[in-house]
Amino acid sequence: GENVEKIGEGTYGVVYKARDRVTNETIALKKIRLEQEDEGVPSTAIREISLLKEMQHRNIVRLQDVVHSDKRLYLVFEYLDLDLKKHMDSSPEFIKDPRQVKMFLYQMLCGIAYCHSHRVLHRDLKPQNLLIDRRTNSLKLADFGLARAFGIPVRTFTHEVVTLWYRAPEILLGSRHYSTPVDVWSVGCIFAEMANRRPLSPGDSEIDELFKIFRILGTPNEDTWPGVTSLPDFKSTFPRWPSKDLATVVPNLEPAGLDLLNSMLCLDPTKRITARSAVEHEYFKDIKFVP
């Protein structure tokens, strides 16, 4: 690429904006910093990433190419300059439109259902990696599948703490056997944040995050979540909070929206709605593609 410009720092390394000399289109170039700098790029990571090139869906940021040169890995993505976090911060009036919230949620779920059908998890969904195409007003998920290829660091390479606000309770409780429901949880948190215009449970440590979740949804026990007490980080000394009615927590949602949110924010991952079923939920029966 020509005239490369640094535009940000992602979870895994520096992100540049560049122009593809051949096609003349603008691309985003992610330089992946690997923990084991000396050994170069693990072949498992290369395999995982190569599979992601096959993933093509209108609500997923397309991975166009993978360049592996001198112990470094560069991922070439389509370029989008706006993410949902910036969008919520800069144009609050836009997100006040319930049709727009519904539209974005629908697109998120379509993208996730597609990934899950290909057995790919995201694991780190947050407003910062939901990108918006201003021309079509469509939302696309970025960084799908990278967590599996590279792991999720506790801190980014610039030592920023990776956010816990969208992390599912089973991960926070130390479960090693989590699956696709973790992404549905994250989307539920983002749904509530779009409706409330502020994060649902902004914890600043794993225990603070768990307790913020429990204060809203109630502390789980063997009745509400069979198996929870045997998760590695569950403590019988956790305070026992009752659950709140979500209508008081997210007052701006229509009843069908609350019903969907309730089924996404189910503490027990086995009872959580799937992305595929969520797309079919009655909340979306009047979906209008907002121009």
Swiss-Prot record:
Binding residue positions for ATP: I7, G8, E9, G10, T11, Y12, G13, V14, V15, K30
Signal peptide residues on this chain, from the entry's feature table: none
Activity-regulation annotation: Phosphorylation at Thr-11 or Tyr-12 inactivates the enzyme, while phosphorylation at Thr-158 activates it.
PROSITE patterns: PROTEIN_KINASE_ATP (PS00107), PROTEIN_KINASE_DOM (PS50011), PROTEIN_KINASE_ST (PS00108)
Lyase among keywords: no
Modified positions (Phosphotyrosine) in chain numbering: Y12
SMART domains listed in its UniProt record: S_TKc (SM00220)
Residue stretches making up the Protein kinase domain: 1-284
Catalysis: reaction(s): L-seryl-[protein] + ATP = O-phospho-L-seryl-[protein] + ADP + H(+); L-threonyl-[protein] + ATP = O-phospho-L-threonyl-[protein] + ADP + H(+); [DNA-directed RNA polymerase] + ATP = phospho-[DNA-directed RNA polymerase] + ADP + H(+)
Active site: D124
EC number(s) from the headed UniProt entry: 2.7.11.22, 2.7.11.23
Keywords assigned by UniProt, alphabetized: ATP-binding, Cell cycle, Cell division, Kinase, Mitosis, Nucleotide-binding, Phosphoprotein, Serine/threonine-protein kinase, Transferase
Cited InterPro entries: CDK, Kinase-like_dom_sf, Prot_kinase_dom, Protein_kinase_ATP_BS, Ser/Thr_kinase_AS
One GO biological process term: regulation of G2/M transition of mitotic cell cycle
Any one GO cellular component localisation term in the record: cyclin-dependent protein kinase holoenzyme complex
Modification Phosphothreonine, positions: T11, T158
The keyword Cell cycle appears for this protein: yes
Family of this protein: Belongs to the protein kinase superfamily. CMGC Ser/Thr protein kinase family. CDC2/CDKX subfamily.
Protein purpose: Plays a key role in the control of the eukaryotic cell cycle. Component of the kinase complex that phosphorylates the repetitive C-terminus of RNA polymerase II.
Protein name per UniProt: Cell division control protein 2 homolog 1
